[in-house]
Amino acid sequence: MAVYTLDLLAQLPEAYQAFGPLIDILPIIPLFFLLLAFVWQASVGFR
């Protein structure tokens, strides 16, 4: 029963199925900000 409930919660509602690939990518966005901070500091010479 618990496994079925967890599986049900892991599925997106039908109205949002089209956004599935986008939701897979969204958690990566904060990593881009981290990389941006290093690129920015490299460009200003790590003041």
UniProtKB/Swiss-Prot annotation:
It is found in: Cellular thylakoid membrane. It holds the Pfam family PsbK. Residues 1-10 form a propeptide. The keyword Metal-binding does not apply. It is a single-pass membrane protein. It comes from the Bacteria. Keywords: Membrane, Photosynthesis, Photosystem II, Reaction center, Thylakoid, Transmembrane, Transmembrane helix. Its main location: membrane. GO terms for biological process: photosynthesis. The chain crosses the membrane at residues 19-39. GO terms for cellular component: photosystem II reaction center; plasma membrane-derived thylakoid membrane. HAMAP family: PSII_PsbK. One of the components of the core complex of photosystem II (PSII). PSII is a light-driven water:plastoquinone oxidoreductase that uses light energy to abstract electrons from H(2)O, generating O(2) and a proton gradient subsequently used for ATP formation. It consists of a core antenna complex that captures photons, and an electron transfer chain that converts photonic excitation into a charge separation. Belongs to the PsbK family. NCBIfam families: PRK02553.1. PSII is composed of 1 copy each of membrane proteins PsbA, PsbB, PsbC, PsbD, PsbE, PsbF, PsbH, PsbI, PsbJ, PsbK, PsbL, PsbM, PsbT, PsbX, PsbY, PsbZ, Psb30/Ycf12, peripheral proteins PsbO, CyanoQ (PsbQ), PsbU, PsbV and a large number of cofactors. It forms dimeric complexes. This is Photosystem II reaction center protein K.
